[in-house]
């Protein structure tokens, strides 16, 4: 079983955990339709940055 050789100081412990923070996902609002979607992703109705890039099933 692995056992530490020396005690890790509170400073080193904090530096070790520096990248463990939870991050809230970036939510964007589509300017044309007002729908919310993840940043850099297409909105559910096929719009990206104000332009329609995919046709939905109802439009096809």
UniProtKB/Swiss-Prot annotation:
Listed GO MF terms:
structural constituent of ribosome
Which parts of the sequence are annotated with region: Disordered? 1-21
GO biological process terms, semicolon-separated: translation
Question: SUPFAM superfamilies per the record?
Answer: Zn-binding ribosomal proteins
Q: Where is the composition biased (Basic residues)?
A: 9-19
Q: Which GO terms describe its cellular component?
A: large ribosomal subunit
Alphabetized, the UniProt keywords read:
Ribonucleoprotein, Ribosomal protein
Superkingdom field: Bacteria
Instruction: Spell out the HAMAP family in the cross-references.
Output: Ribosomal_bL32 (MF_00340)
Known PANTHER family for this protein? 50S RIBOSOMAL PROTEIN L32, LARGE RIBOSOMAL SUBUNIT PROTEIN BL32
Q: Which family does it belong to?
A: Belongs to the bacterial ribosomal protein bL32 family.
Q: What is this protein called?
A: Large ribosomal subunit protein bL32
Q: Which organism is it from?
A: Albidiferax ferrireducens (strain ATCC BAA-621 / DSM 15236 / T118) (Rhodoferax ferrireducens)
